Amino acid sequence: MVRIGIVDTGIQNPNHPAIVGKIVAGRNFSLDRRKKDDISSTTYHGMAVASVITSINPNVELVIAKVLNYWGEGTPNTTADGIIYCVNQGCKIINCSVAGPPSKKLEEAIRYANDKEVIVVAASGNDGKTTKYYPACYPDVVTVGAADNEGNRADFSTHNECVDTLALGVDIEVAFRDGTINDTGTSFSAPIITGKISLLIENLSK
């Protein structure tokens, strides 16, 4: 069973059918941290990302690193803390549907993951420009942009030399509260690639 780290907002509903029983560890690194083991969230983003992964490969274990608060606020250093935590929890892949400025600590966290042979997948961003966001633009990160329903780059998808591949990013069904909604963004393109990589790892280990 492949273990996957999700560096994001935490989990809105741990009993949602898409993820129930799959979370094996979690830590709160966000700016609004109250308790270090509190990975709960009133926003759905992290759970939505997790549900995209499990829709592709249900046979996974999830490690949750909460690095963003309700408003989506975080720092490169909280993201770095989340990545390091997921590596140390034995994850083979880490999904980062977060984007922000660079920092030395974040760069070192990516290098640490690479040294431990952990694959980091990151969303390119949603500004439709050539802006460089991080961790997406660090070397050896699998950077994912969004494609539309025709397979072309979606207008909102950040595009630059950092982008390695595209995945569908329009009208993706994701977990929300007790049910689902359809949402759009590179945040949901990245976990499609994460899920597919997990299938490859699973098949290679047989």
Task: Label each residue range with its predicted role.
Residues V63, I119-A122, V142-T143, L166, ...:
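Structural detector of well-ordered beta-strand residues that form the stable sheet scaffold
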Residues M1-E61, D81, N88-Q89:
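Active-site core segment of subtilase-fold serine proteases
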